[in-house]
Amino acid sequence: GVIPCGESCVFIPCISSVVGCTCKNKVCYRN
């Protein structure tokens, strides 16, 4: 939840969710 994955999730889900990233405030974060 604190490390930006360098991906936005405004229109599509986080592709980086496969490595544990989740959408928060339209940006993908992990941990």
Curated annotation (Swiss-Prot):
Pfam families: Cyclotide
UniProt PTM comment: This is a cyclic peptide. Contains 3 disulfide bonds.
PROSITE patterns assigned: CYCLOTIDE, CYCLOTIDE_BRACELET
An individual GO BP term: defense response
UniProt cross-link Cyclopeptide (Gly-Asn), position: 1-31
SS bonds (residue pairs): 5-21, 9-23, 14-28
Membrane keyword on record: no
Keywords assigned by UniProt, alphabetized: Disulfide bond, Knottin, Plant defense
Family annotation (SUPFAM superfamilies): Cyclotides
The UniProt record lists the keyword Disulfide bond: yes
Function field: Probably participates in a plant defense mechanism (Potential). Binds to and induces leakage in phospholipd membranes, particularly ones containing 1-palmitoyl-2-oleophosphatidylethanolamine (POPE).
Similarity comment: family membership: Belongs to the cyclotide family. Bracelet subfamily.
Domain comment, as recorded: The presence of a 'disulfide through disulfide knot' structurally defines this protein as a knottin.
Protein name per its UniProtKB record: Cyclotide mech-6
